[in-house]
Swiss-Prot record:
Organism: Rhodococcus jostii (strain RHA1)
One annotated GO molecular function: glutamate-cysteine ligase activity
UniProt enzyme class: ligase
Function statement: ATP-dependent carboxylate-amine ligase which exhibits weak glutamate--cysteine ligase activity.
One Pfam family this sequence matches: GCS2
Entry protein name: Putative glutamate--cysteine ligase 2-3
Region ranges (Disordered): 367-390
Region annotation (Peptidase M20) ranges: 408-793
Keywords recorded for this protein, A-Z: ATP-binding, Ligase, Nucleotide-binding
One example of a Gene Ontology biological process annotation: modified amino acid biosynthetic process
């Protein structure tokens, strides 16, 4: 077809219905559909799903306008009922026992015939229809396009979680559920409409399906329309993804029709390989490798998508879609799948409700794209330095003792600054905000920086920011503070105690933020000799930490080294400590869920004896790690939760273990997940139990760079003197500052905040407080770091 008469395309979208109070699936589709036009909005197998049918269009702009209009009407009608709408292959919060199959005769028969398949069909897909009225051509083209379906599936992957919230490890778990049905998968290689019709008749006659509409092949001639229908894709929260898939599928159909009519063979791929490639796409999405079925071999998803788009350039140019598809496909591969965004949302605070909220917002078109957040790759190790042969001079590091730098000496100015520091800190302390919710805190910092004449850069999402101060130089030194508080109810009774129930600055981040604000004031008045970046980071208290988001947003671009301070209640005010090498430990989370046959304790041989298997895992995994890992790495597994059973005379059917795994060695940390996975498999092999391992990688150790540690020591000595600089011990706690040091050299020091008289209050505890006199030492140390210059000796 020519561009003047391109094939028309239409879309069917399926949407989950979400209770906006609980964020769970709700079976209120009949109530919602009663408020909507029945020619566009229709029911589905489950009462928690609504299908929306677009019109047909020759241009993508018309299709987009249609989809936007129908989504908006659906979202608005649903919100009036307290219902949210989510376009995704699956959603993570549901109670399957509360779900109901739609009460029509057809769906009732499907429930009777397929039982658990129908009951567990809590999934949604996107179907794309392309004009192809010749049924003989349609059945042949369906077979010719089959090898390319994995790419379209990967682009749409949006179902990483099961309905119970468990991470499946797949990008499209919907595909796994869908392929359980007897008439799914790649289309049969038939050569005519008559042959295809005979196949469908045989399936109906066999009783496996009850009508032709239940032939759920990945691509099929539509039962009711003169179209070829794509059925392999997950529902897509973002309309850009729907348009990309629709444009690519239309171009692919056009190319294969042209090839069929010209007598050219299509790509010949065995069905087994096609099925394997579909599995890989469901497993990996856009984040790992896909299978190039033409070779065959594994290739990065971005390469395969790019080659696929380029192969369709003639058809895309004919329809006027080339530029748009190039842009959308580049964005998709750069920023990853919906499945990856959902895992990112969960990783920030560990809340599945955040995943649901993300899907609701994207479906409604209420969010802008956030930079993809991936764990930064390790920095290539450079030659180690011992600091020998180096001399260093200060750029007036202790300029507060000099009267010739300004009319007001540092001693005079700090009397004012200390009062401001206390004022700022107490304001932040009274208004704590949890990770990725630090909007007020960000606003306070932003207003302060703008008032100093600086130009802060706000991070996507509105929490966190950074700005530069000083001259434009080749070198840029970064200073980092964290903004977030903890879900800990404060019990200090202070006049400025937290006003937010259940939330407090129990880790001293209010002081960290205050000290960097103070440093900004000093550096603005007394400009440093080199450019300094002040990084106010959100969400340190999450896994893998807001540092990952901050790096992805560009805060380290152009930075040559980075420093940070952390409050330490084990050091008195006036003292600081640091060390070369690891100063914190890695911090991973291990969750094991177990299932087995339950029963009476009088007959344990008829059960899986899950309690015994759990005990073996509790003791055995620690023993395996003790024997397989060098003891000098201080790798420790600690179980914090072991739950199974209710009463003494009943063997339980399920149990759960949750623990943390920490290591002082970065190399050991990198090897822990496969070691734990293998050990659990072998420990539980003799027992008749099923299990699911959820291994959440946290942060690696903070490993202080030798040269940067030398900088930090000299800055500290210039502030508090040699006698007040201590050698830090390595903490078993974790700190996401480690991610910065995976990218650039840097170092962290601990700042003493104990007043030396009362009982030490530990970090993360309800009674934690700090001696505010410590903050001025922190400000001076941060400023001193900006006034060092290396000199070759």
């Amino acid at each position: 077809m020519l561009a003047s008469d391109p094939r028309k395309v239409g879309v069917e979208e399926e949407f989950h219905l979400i209770d906006l109070k609980t964020r769970r699936l709700t079976t209120r589709a009949p109530e919602l559909l009663a408020r909507l036009p029945d020619d566009v909005y229709v029911d589905e197998l489950q009462q928690c799903v609504v299908e929306v049918n677009s019109g047909v269009y020759a241009d993508l702009d018309g299709l987009r306008s249609d989809l936007e209009r129908h989504r908006r009407l659906l979202v608005d009608a649903a919100e009036d009922l307290g219902i949210g709408v989510a376009a995704a292959g699956s959603v993570p919060l549901a109670l399957p026992a509360e779900m109901h199959v739609t009460g029509t005769q057809r769906y009732g028969r499907m429930l009777a015939d397929y039982q658990v398949l129908a009951r567990e069909q809590l999934i949604c897909g996107t179907q794309v229809h392309v004009d192809l009225p010749d049924r003989d051509e349609a059945v042949q083209v369906a077979h010719r396009v089959a090898p390319h379906m994995p790419v379209l599936l990967a682009l749409s992957a949006s179902s990483p979680f099961r309905s119970d919230g468990a991470d499946t490890g797949y990008a499209s778990a919907r595909t796994l559920l869908w392929l359980r049905w007897p008439s799914t998968g790649p289309a049969a290689p038939v050569s005519s409409a008559a042959e295809y019709g005979a196949l469908i008749d045989d399936l109906v006659a066999s009783g496996v399906i009850s009508d032709p509409g239940m032939a759920y092949f990945d691509v099929r001639p539509s039962v009711k329309l003169p179209t070829l229908e794509l059925r392999v894709c997950d529902s897509c929260p973002r309309l850009d993804t729907v348009l990309l898939v629709a444009a690519l599928f239309r171009a692919l159909v056009e190319r294969e029709v042209e090839g069929l009519r010209a007598g050219r063979k299509g790509v010949e791929v065995l069905p087994t390989l096609t099925r394997a490639a579909l599995w890989r796409a469901a497993r990996s999405g856009l984040e790992e490798e896909l299978v190039d079925v033409t070779v065959p071999q594994a290739r990065p998803a971005s390469e395969l998508v790019g080659d696929f788009v380029n192969s369709l350039r003639p058809q895309l140019e004919e329809t006027g879609d080339w530029d748009r598809v190039v842009e959308l496909s580049a964005e998709a591969t750069a920023h990853g799948s919906s499945a990856a965004r959902q895992r990112q949302a969960l990783g920030r605070r560990g809340r599945l409700t955040d995943v649901v909220d993300l899907l609701l917002a994207e479906t409604a078109g209420r969010t802008e794209h956030l930079p993809d957040v991936e764990v930064p790759p390790p920095r290539e190790p450079g030659p180690k330095s011992t600091g020998a042969g180096r001399t260093r001079r200060y750029w007036s590091a202790r300029f507060w003792d000099r009267g010739d730098t300004a009319d007001m000496t540092w001693t005079e100015s700090t009397e004012l600054d200390e009062k401001k520091l206390v004022e700022w800190r107490r304001d932040l302390h009274a208004h704590p905000e949890l990770s990725f919710e630090e909007r007020r805190t960000t606003g306070v910092v932003r207003d302060h920086l703008v008032g100093l004449g600086l130009e802060p850069v706000l991070m996507p999402g509105g929490t966190g920011l950074w700005c530069d101060v000083g001259p434009e130089t080749g070198e840029c030194i970064a200073l980092r503070a964290d903004l977030d508080a903890l879900p800990v109810a404060e019990t200090t009774g202070l006049p400025f105690e937290s006003r937010v129930p259940g939330v407090s600055h129990a880790c001293g981040h209010d002081a960290h933020t205050t000290m960097l604000m103070g440093a900004a004031s000093v550096l603005t008045k007394y400009p440093p000799p080199t450019r300094v970046r002040l990084v106010f980071q959100p969400a340190e208290e999450t896994t893998p930490g807001g540092a990952v988001d901050t790096i992805a947003a560009g805060a380290l671009d152009g930075v040559s080294k980075i420093f940070a301070l952390h409050c330490d209640p084990h050091l008195e005010v006036g003292k600081l400590s640091t060390r070369t090498g690891p100063i914190t430990s890695s911090n991973d989370s291990v969750t094991v869920r177990l299932w087995s046959a339950g029963g009476h304790t009088a007959r344990p041989h008829l059960t899986g004896d899950l309690i015994h298997a759990t005990a073996v895992l509790v003791t055995g995994l620690a023993s395996v790690l003790d024997r397989r890992i060098d003891a000098r790495t201080a790798t420790v597994l600690t179980w914090g939760k072991v739950a199974a059973g209710q009463v003494a005379n009943s063997v339980p059917e399920s149990g759960e273990l949750v623990g943390t795994l920490r290591s002082a060695s970065r190399e050991t940390w990198a090897s822990l997940e496969p070691l734990v996975t293998d050990a659990i498999c072998h420990l539980l092999a003799p027992y008749n139990v099923r299990y699911e391992l959820s291994y959440l990688r946290g942060v690696p150790p903070v490993v202080n760079d030798p040269d940067c540690t030398a900088d930090l020591r000299e800055a500290i000595e210039s502030v508090v003197g040699f006698d007040h600089l201590a050698e830090a011990h390595q903490s078993s706690g974790g700190e996401d500052f480690a991610w910065y040091l995976e990218k650039v050299p840097g170092a962290m020091a601990r700042l003493g905040v104990w007043d030396g008289t009362g009982t030490r209050q530990e970090l993360h505890q309800p009674g934690f407080n700090l001696d505010e006199r410590a903050m001025i030492h922190g400000v001076r140390t941060l400023v001193a770091l900006t006034r060092l210059e290396d000199q070759s000796g």
